[in-house]
């Protein structure tokens, strides 16, 4: 069957969370290169503004995904400056590693707040806008750790299982509409989030630009499952039919069970500290007001 013509992206508005760096920034650049209008959202407004300088026509907006009021203000500000949002990329997320039994409650809660509640806020706020206009595309960034539980990152892995599951369920609810839902599942990406990870025999890492390219591809040719790289998706499908013992033996043979569990804590220290202390700099109400009226003091 011939592949359908790509959907035009030029002039479309895309809102990207956690877009000041990493996958988010690479996606912002890739979308802008297709003529899309980009709203860069990030908790660190200064970094977002610096990022926007490298993305033609982009606007930088403060965003705390854990705060529904802040998220709504972000979408309102994006639409006020660029027009109705056609695409939301729920990219913001953190990964803090270590043995599950040693993980403190604050670390677990922080990951759930950002990786789960942040995605839920975005979905619940943008989908009514899409439904009112009769179209839209929701892209949620999960992980291959959301398809296969990875030791050393149990809470992170659990949050990404949630992202995949809620995305799949909501897609089912929207099948009779023109609203698209996609779930992107990369292997470890060469960003600060992957600092210190073990690179075992057969392990695969990708670049932020690889993920961004797949996101643009899925906007042009909508589909739900978006593994990055695509080959890993086929591998997971094949190994998924094997008995659990066989799957685990293969994982140990390729040291997949050490990718997160064997991470170098010293190499990860700077990232882990930033992730642990990435608290919003403004009270939610004040932040929302500033986002709405464009003020910054």
Regions found by a protein language model. Give the residues of each.
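Canonical Rossmann dinucleotide-binding motif of NAD(H)/NADP(H)-dependent dehydrogenases/reductases
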Residues: 6-38
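Substrate-binding pocket helix/loop in short-chain dehydrogenase/reductase
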Residues: 99-100, 104-112
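Active-site helix of classical SDR
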Residues: 123, 159
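Residue(s) in the substrate-gating loop at a strand-loop-helix junction
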Residues: 143
């Amino acid at each position: 069957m011939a592949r359908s013509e790509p959907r035009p992206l030029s002039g479309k508005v895309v809102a990207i969370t956690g877009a000041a760096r990493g996958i988010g920034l690479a996606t912002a650049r890739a979308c802008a290169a297709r003529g899309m209008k980009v709203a860069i959202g990030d908790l660190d407004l200064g970094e977002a503004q610096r990022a926007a300088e490298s993305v033609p026509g982009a606007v930088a907006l403060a965003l705390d995904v854990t705060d529904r009021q802040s998220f709504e203000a972000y979408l309102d500000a994006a639409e006020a400056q660029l027009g109705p949002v056609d695409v939301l990329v729920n990219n913001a997320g953190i990964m803090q590693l270590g043995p599950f039994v040693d993980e403190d409650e604050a670390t677990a809660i922080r990951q759930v707040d950002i990786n789960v509640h942040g995605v839920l806020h975005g979905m619940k706020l943008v989908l009514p806008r899409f439904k009112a206009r009769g179209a839209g595309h929701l892209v949620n960034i999960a992980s291959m750790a959301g398809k296969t539980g990875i030791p050393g990152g149990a809470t992170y892995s659990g949050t990404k299982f949630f992202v995949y599951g809620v995305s799949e369920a909501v897609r089912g609810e929207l099948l009779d509409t023109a609203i698209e839902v996609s779930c992107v599942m990369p292997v470890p990406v060469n960003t600060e989030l992957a600092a210190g990870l073990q690179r075992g025999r057969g392990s695969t890492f990708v670049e932020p630009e690889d993920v961004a390219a797949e996101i643009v591809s899925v906007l042009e040719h909508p589909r739900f499952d978006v593994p990055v790289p695509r080959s890993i998706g086929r591998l997971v499908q094949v190994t998924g039919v094997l008995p659990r013992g066989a799957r685990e033996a293969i994982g140990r043979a390729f040291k997949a069970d050490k990718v997160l569990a064997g991470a170098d804590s010293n190499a990860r220290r700077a990232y882990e500290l930033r992730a642990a202390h990435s608290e919003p700099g403004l009270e939610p109400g004040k932040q929302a007001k500033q986002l709405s009226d464009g003020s910054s003091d």
